[in-house]
Design a protein with these regions (language model features):
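Conserved functional hotspot residues or short segments at active or partner-binding sites
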Residues: 112-113, 117-319
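Intrinsically disordered, low-complexity polyampholyte segments enriched for Lys and acidic residues
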Residues: 2-3, 7, 13, 34
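Local alpha-helix boundary/kink/capping signal
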Residues: 17, 22-25, 288
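Conserved acidic, small-residue-rich alpha-beta core segments centered on
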Residues: 1, 22-186
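Short linear motifs in low-complexity or flexible loops
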Residues: 11, 16-19, 31
């Protein structure tokens, strides 16, 4: 429901955003429910970019898939997780409950968001990593079988089979990632230092009212050196070469977390996003009027292109 509320800002009234396809209990056969957004949309004009990666799942994928299928905006990042199941809860006599999977979500063009249930289902993300999918677009496996090939409103080819494939691929940036960084980051030491530093310097930090003022001050505090000393006290040995390679990354995170502790999320995101290549790519697409965004309003013509979506979705039903 939250996804529908958000997407109502981007599409005209009555346009089908996604389909919930599944087997309904107490009924025989299959049932198809199209969910329609009611009420006037607020943002039918203007460019839209949706950011996704391998951790984007469920409602995020429904939103991204609908935006992509209607050619309403550009999807930027990496292939999404592939989670599109619907569960219904049944209360038992002893007050316990069972949740039964009854449906799957499909995008307007008919693509099934849920990844296939195979024996190695739980290893999917790991297999993507081993295959190099996070780092090179040509390493992404796409099943181009006719049954998994679909068309967007403007006739672009998109593929089903699980998850949403972005229009613009952005690889993971590992240029500043080192074993040292992974150790201090995964152990929570960056967060811990940021809290400790904020508490120790709260009287000074509270003087800064804007992100720019706070970031300018923190840039002069040699945070990386102070942090590595802190980490050494937590039994993480210094690795000079690795620290030098990861310095900018570490300092960016430290400044962002300190800003969050001081100014809240209004201070956190502007600093953190300076290292976000996916966001930068999306902004470039918007600023340069990427070709997909030249035709950015949902019209009756787009609606007509999907007038037979019910048949498409039923033909591709997987239960």
């Amino acid at each position: 429901r939250d996804k529908l509320h958000v997407e109502g800002f981007h599409a005209q009234n009555g346009v089908a955003h996604f389909a919930q396809v599944g087997q309904q209990l107490r009924q025989q056969g299959m049932a198809l429910h199209d969910f329609l957004r009611q009420g006037a949309a607020c943002v039918c004009q203007g460019d839209v970019a949706v950011l996704v990666d391998e951790t984007s799942a469920s409602a995020a994928e429904i939103l991204a898939g609908a935006i992509q299928d209607w050619d309403r905006g550009v999807v930027v990042g990496r292939r999404s997780f592939g989670k599109g199941l619907v569960q219904q809860q049944f209360t038992l006599r002893d007050s316990s409950a069972i949740r039964l999977t009854i449906s799957r979500f499909h995008t307007p063009s008919g693509r099934c968001i849920q990844k296939p249930y195979a024996e190695d289902y739980e290893d999917d993300i790991y297999k993507r990593y081993l295959h190099g999918e996070f780092y090179a677009e040509d390493s992404v496996f796409i099943d181009k079988a006719d049954s998994l090939t679909f068309k967007t409103a403007n006739g672009r080819t998109v593929y089903g089979g699980g998850g949403i494939m972005p229009d613009m691929f952005v690889p993971r940036d590992t240029s500043e990632v080192t074993p040292y960084f992974n150790k201090v980051n995964n152990s929570g030491l960056i967060h811990e230092f940021a809290f400790a530093y904020t508490d120790a310097n709260r009287n000074t930090l509270k003087q800064f009212k804007t992100t720019e003022e706070l970031e300018s001050y923190l840039a002069k505090q040699d945070l990386c050196s102070k942090f590595t000393n802190f980490a050494e006290g937590k039994n993480v040995k210094k690795k000079s070469n690795q620290i030098a390679k990861s310095k900018n990354y570490i300092e960016n995170l430290l400044k962002a977390y300190i800003a969050r502790n001081t100014l809240g999320y209004n201070g956190f995101y502007p600093i953190l996003h300076k290292k976000d290549n996916t966001l930068k790519k999306a902004l470039d697409a918007l600023h340069n009027n990427w070709q997909l965004l030249e035709n950015n309003s949902v019209t009756d013509t787009l609606q007509n292109n999907f007038e037979d979506t019910s048949k498409v979705k039923q033909d591709n039903l997987e239960i």
